[in-house]
Amino acid sequence: MGSFATAVQSRLRERLAALRPRFDWETEHHVAATPVDIAGRADSHVALVELEWRRADPADNTAKLFRHLDEEALAADVVDVFQLFTGYYDLASGGVSSKRLNAEFVGRVGTQALDSFRYRAVDFALDPPQRGGDRPKDWEGVADTTAREIGEYL
């Protein structure tokens, strides 16, 4: 992961910790063998945040998480999975790419199959820079807005 992605991940964790202090938030949490960008735990409630920058197959992340949760790799009564999608998944003609649609489909199916699990796709209103490119000037505000959206859901 690049330094910008790490900075965004840290900013989101810090904002979530301020907004929802009852959760113990950490970055790079593992669910079985799958690393999750940000995770928070409050008693028997777990929140998982996966940030999709420009992954070729974001549905794979969703499927792996729900597979591990189905195998009870994470003991919790309620698990909220938030999958954040950057502008990379937006189509110039409007709408979103099939990559994102597939990930959202897997999330919906996982939620229907597993009673204690909830999935939410979240727009992360940022176009990630190419490797070595400049960070968008408003990235901190975007991270803060996204953290508030997640916090309101929790």
Indicate where each model-derived feature is located.
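Acidic-basic catalytic patches of nuclease active cores, encompassing PD-(D/E)XK
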Residues: 1-29, 154
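Short, conserved, surface-exposed binding loops centered on an aromatic residue
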Residues: 30, 39-41, 75
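Conserved catalytic cores of phosphodiester-cleaving nucleases, focusing on short active-site segments
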Residues: 38-40, 44-55, 68
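Hydrophobic/aromatic beta-strand patches that form the interior of the parallel beta-sheet core
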Residues: 47-49, 82, 120-122
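Domain-level recognition of nuclease-like catalytic cores that cleave nucleotide substrates
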Residues: 88-154
